[in-house]
């Protein structure tokens, strides 16, 4: 065969012609030639779908299952004009790439981030170590971290009498790719579940499709409406770290089971091997002196019964405190203004957290009986699930969801040890009054705006020692300097008021303070029409029987008072003074 015959045969072969076809998503790209050269060099496929361009998946000659969880890394801070022809040579230096997914925009540029999946887990970890902050362009650094491949859904609204097998069977009927179902027994009645379950799927895609299918209003299970959301993905702990763990996580305990009973049960194989036990509701952490004793106890006691309850025993997962704090913020949509603190499991709040978050720290500090926990963080949404599935406060919003099956992350309860209780603000130092329900309330000085020296006769009343005295006598102390006495001419004044009502002008000056009244407006003289004034809390006047003070005389001589005629002997009820008012009168707490 000559060279011409060979060329003719190649041109007539349809497979050869199809191999030169430009893949969809590559045709028309700014760097089309570079992408085609990359495909020819590596033999990988490239296709664009659903706003992302997939390179590989699987690679040429791949045989075997899909790479395990933890083989994918997230790549961020990618320049908008960088594509696979520059990314692949960088990331293939640390391992074999199974798949690279570059998020694309409609204008043909990338969206600044991508996902790279390796064939093995150790290659992904190496990529994080070596390629994070890699300078892809002068002055442009890539951000590389482990990707959270969430394959777990939270499903609520499950009938409490359903068993794990029934739930697994029902979920598998309506969704695909179900691997496992995690169901927690009720702490009070082990024959019932807690009304929710965690469903694990074989891949993130399968979980996403199941979530879309199970959205509320589309499917009912056992005739019940269900709630579906992403669960908090289980935190991945390095295998080398897990090899040093000597703490066991024990769940499904009875509420009545004591720490002494748990210590005796787990220490039966080697007396003295258990250092201590920390029990929280229906789960516990058992600390051993050596890892061998912990593993031996786990193998022998997992699945056994203790005081009528079947135990689930696993190795606890240690988590770096700083890493866990960052993870919590990312998983719940970013932290709020509250400082990150340890989660306190299972506290029943007697007050509405939506309302408390509005008033802020000083008001939260007065609310009982759980005020110590309200001031630490504002609970709006995104409620986390602790190791035993209990609700705990979390910041508003949910990026990866607000629920977690928990697997014994024992660093949580270490956070709160030896921590000082936060105290509220003491507005008036060194003054104690009787506690109420059972909060100790500090009195505070409430300064009403527009205080003037001309009203010096209105002195602040002494702070009462008892709250009840403050309620009863506050107004009495306020009006006592005026020396209000019964006026025999009250009836005549009322008649004059009725006659002058039509000629009294309205005051157009807006009130200088648009706040709510601290106390109600009182009218001392009956049947006297109120005059609209530029008062701060209301329009009302108090009559004087004997205006003897210099201040009142000045008021009567004031030209502005002349237009009021017979009302010049009255003074506004809204006293511009400083007075002592108990805080509970300002912010009602009961």
Swiss-Prot record:
Q: Which domain of life is it from?
A: Eukaryota
- Which ranges carry the RRM domain? 71-149, 151-233, 246-318
- The keyword S-adenosyl-L-methionine is annotated on this UniProt entry: no
Q: What is this protein called?
A: RNA-binding protein 47
Its GO CC terms?
A: apolipoprotein B mRNA editing enzyme complex; cytoplasm; nucleus
- Listed Polar residues bias regions: 8-21
Annotated region (Disordered), positions in chain: 1-25
């Amino acid at each position: 065969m000559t060279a011409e015959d060979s060329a003719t045969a190649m041109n007539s072969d349809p497979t050869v012609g199809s191999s030169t076809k430009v893949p969809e998503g590559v045709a028309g790209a700014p760097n089309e030639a570079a992408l085609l050269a990359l495909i020819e060099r590596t033999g990988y496929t490239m296709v664009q779908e659903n706003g992302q361009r997939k390179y590989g998946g699987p690679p040429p000659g791949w045989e075997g299952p899909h790479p395990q969880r933890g083989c994918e890394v997230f790549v961020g801070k990618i320049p908008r004009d960088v594509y696979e022809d520059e990314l692949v040579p960088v990331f293939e230096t640390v391992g074999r790439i199974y798949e690279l997914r570059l998020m694309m925009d409609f204008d043909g540029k990338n969206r600044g981030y991508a996902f790279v999946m390796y064939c093995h887990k150790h290659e992904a970890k190496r990529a994080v170590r070596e390629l994070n902050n890699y300078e892809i362009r002068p002055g442009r650094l890539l951000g590389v971290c482990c990707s959270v491949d969430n394959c777990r859904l939270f499903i609520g609204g499950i009938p409490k009498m359903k068993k794990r097998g029934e739930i697994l069977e029902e979920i598998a009927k309506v969704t695909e790719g179900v691997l496992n179902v995690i169901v927690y027994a009720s702490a009070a009645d082990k024959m019932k579940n807690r009304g929710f379950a965690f469903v694990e799927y074989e891949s993130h895609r399968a979980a996403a499709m199941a979530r879309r299918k199970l959205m509320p209003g589309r499917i009912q299970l056992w005739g019940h409406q269900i709630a579906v959301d992403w669960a908090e993905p289980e935190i991945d702990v390095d295998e080398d770290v897990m090899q040093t763990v000597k703490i066991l996580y024990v769940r499904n305990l009875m509420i009545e089971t004591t720490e002494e009973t748990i210590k005796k049960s787990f220490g039966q194989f080697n007396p003295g091997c258990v250092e201590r036990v920390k029990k929280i509701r229906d789960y516990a952490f058992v600390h051993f002196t050596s890892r061998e004793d912990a593993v031996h106890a786990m193998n022998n006691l997992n699945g056994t019964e203790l005081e009528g309850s079947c135990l689930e025993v696993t190795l606890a997962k240690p988590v770096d405190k700083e890493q866990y704090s960052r993870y919590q913020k990312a998983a719940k949509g970013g932290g709020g203004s509250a400082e990150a603190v340890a989660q306190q499991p299972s506290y029943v709040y007697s007050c509405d957290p939506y309302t408390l978050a509005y008033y802020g720290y000083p008001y939260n500090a007065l609310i009982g009986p759980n005020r110590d926990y309200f001031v630490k963080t504002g609970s709006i949404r995104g409620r986390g699930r602790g190791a035993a599935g209990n609700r705990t406060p979390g910041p508003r919003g949910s990026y990866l969801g607000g629920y977690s099956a928990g697997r014994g992350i024992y660093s949580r309860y270490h956070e709160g040890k030896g921590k000082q209780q936060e105290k509220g603000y003491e507005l008036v130092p060194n003054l104690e009054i009787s506690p109420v329900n059972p909060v100790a309330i500090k009195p505070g000085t409430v300064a009403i705006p527009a205080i003037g020296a001309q009203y010096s006769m209105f002195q602040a009343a002494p702070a009462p020692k008892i709250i009840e005295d403050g309620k009863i006598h506050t107004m009495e102390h306020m009006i006592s300097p005026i020396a209000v006495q019964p006026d025999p001419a009250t009836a005549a004044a009322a008649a004059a008021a009725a006659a002058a009502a039509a000629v009294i002008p309205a005051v157009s000056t807006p009130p200088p303070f648009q706040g709510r009244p601290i106390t109600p407006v009182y009218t001392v003289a009956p049947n006297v029409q109120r005059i609209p004034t530029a008062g701060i809390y209301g329009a009302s006047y108090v009559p004087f029987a004997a205006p003897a003070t210099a201040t009142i005389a000045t008021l009567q001589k004031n030209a502005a008072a002349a237009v009021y005629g017979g009302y010049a002997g009255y003074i506004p009820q809204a006293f511009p003074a400083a007075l002592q008012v108990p805080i509970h009168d300002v912010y009602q707490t009961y």
